[in-house]
A protein has these predicted regions:
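Conserved anion/nucleotide-ligand pocket segment
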Residues: 180-261
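Glycine-rich, charge-decorated loop segments at or immediately adjacent to ligand/cofactor-binding or catalytic sites
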Residues: 84-89, 158-181
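Glycine-rich oxoanion-binding loops at beta->alpha junctions
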Residues: 92-122, 134
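Conserved functional hotspot residues or short segments at active or partner-binding sites
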Residues: 287-397
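Glycine-rich, aromatic-lined ligand/substrate-binding cores of catalytic
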Residues: 232-314
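Short internal beta-strands
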Residues: 73-80, 160
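Glycine/threonine-rich flexible loop motifs
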Residues: 131-143
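Bacterial Sec-dependent N-terminal signal peptides
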Residues: 1-26
Length: 416
């Protein structure tokens, strides 16, 4: 009986993998690299910056694929670690990877930038992480800082491209302003930038946008190669790619979570204001608090007639985080027309409604949280102007003011 059960599990796993392969319409960069015989890596000592999202369509880790086919000599860990076992903001330690025995150099510990010593002994640095398409997610900052060190040492960088889960058409939010460059706002790009990570790497490399963590260093340009996907189109949802979703970080468990992140993440910078689904099963997918009347908030938001957005009253009890173990009430939101929906303004409509109904002002919280909110926004204009009346109309023109120019610039780097 034991052997029969084991065999059944093996057959089920094989069927799942076969199904994934059959349904995949898009080949990620790691598969294209493999099809090309690992061109550019043969005979070289290879370093790999990755996390659990670096897999092929059969869920095989890029670590394993490279270790079997080229001379993989070192791993580099972004936020959450190479194996994804570190919580958001948690310090990642350097050490050895238990599975492979390879040295792991932390890029989210005592330093955020690879040191020359860390890169000693490699001939090329490969990057393979699933991006989420939003400027404040730290993986793209980690990539840029690593590109800077590689440039100074003459080490080439190879980016294995992956789909942008927000698609390649959605661009929203202002560019980062001087004085607000930070690890969560490292480049002068919109909050949602509509590029794959490979396209973004080319843009920051060629346009002189890679100016260090605080945006005040001379731009540098590394020797960059992007291994493109095959079959991806800018209009695709992630589900249409046919690729399995492996969460790039603990609070992005589903493709929808990546879409919701820029819709609620700014509100998440205000501790003890609204729960945004973190600590429950819908991260970045809701706005709730003990003192909210869910039906009242839904009615107020419905009255705004936000294009492409529908609202549903919800009640839930977070397991941890803000309002942990307390019954809270609020709204969950849905995109009925993603193309027209202003996804990054959703959170501001919620703040407007909450202020109109309950006079709750998140900017009365600690200066530290306001500072972080401004850094993620890339400017203090939003907090200053929005707080005056809590009206989305007061910031919407500013919020979209850089989009057209950035679209024109970024088209130069479209691979797809």
């Amino acid at each position: 009986m034991l052997y029969r059960n084991i065999l059944r599990h093996i057959l089920c796993a094989s069927a799942l993998i076969a199904s994934l392969v059959a349904s995949a319409r898009v080949k990620p960069g790691i598969e294209v690299l493999r099809d090309r015989g690992f061109e550019g890596l043969q005979g070289k000592r290879v370093g790999l910056l990755t996390n659990p999202s670096g897999v092929d369509s059969q869920l095989r880790s890029t670590i394993d694929i490279l270790a079997e086919n080229v001379n993989l000599v070192a791993l580099y860990a972004p936020e959450h670690g190479v194996r994804g076992d570190i919580w958001a903001g948690g310090k990642v330690e350097s050490g050895k990877d238990a599975a492979t025995g390879l040295p792991v150099h932390s890029l989210y510990g005592s330093t955020r930038q690879a040191t020359p010593e860390m890169l000693k002994g490699i001939d090329i640095l490969v990057y393979d992480i699933q991006d989420v398409g939003t400027r404040s997610y730290t993986f793209i900052s980690c990539l840029g800082l690593t590109m800077r060190t590689c440039a100074s040492l003459g080490i080439p960088v190879m980016v294995l491209d992956r789909p942008n889960p927000l698609g390649g058409l959605k661009v929203e939010g202002p560019l980062v302003r001087e004085g607000y460059f930070f690890y969560v706002s490292q480049y002068a790009i919109p909050y949602v930038y509509g590029l794959t990570v490979g396209e973004l790497a080319m843009l920051i490399n060629d346009e002189g946008l890679n100016r260090g963590q605080k945006g005040n260093e001379d731009p540098v340009r590394c020797r960059l190669t992007v291994v493109p996907m095959e079959g991806w189109e800018r209009s695709m949802t992630y589900e249409q790619t046919g690729l399995p979703w492996v969460m790039p970080s603990p609070n992005i468990p589903y493709p929808r979570s990546a879409i919701c992140y820029p819709s609620a993440g700014l509100v998440g910078e205000f501790n003890n204001y609204l729960n945004i689904g973190i600590g429950y099963t819908i991260p970045f997918d809701a706005f709730a608090a003990e003192w909210i009347d869910a039906d009242e908030l839904k009615a107020k938001l419905d009255s705004y007639k936000v294009p492409g957005v529908a609202w549903r009253a919800v009640h839930y009890t977070p397991f941890y985080g803000s309002s942990a173990k307390k019954l809270i009430h609020g709204v969950q939101y849905y995109y009925t027309d993603y193309e027209t929906a202003p996804i990054t303004l959703v959170q501001f409509y919620v703040m407007q409604a909450v202020y109109e109904l309950y006079k709750k002002d998140p900017f009365e919280l600690s200066e530290n949280r306001i500072s972080m909110f401004n850094k993620v926004c890339g400017t203090d204009f939003v907090s200053t102007e929005f707080r005056k009346r809590f009206r989305v109309a007061d910031i919407s023109s500013y919020w979209s003011g850089d989009v057209a120019a950035f679209r024109a610039l970024s088209r130069k780097y479209y691979i797809y």
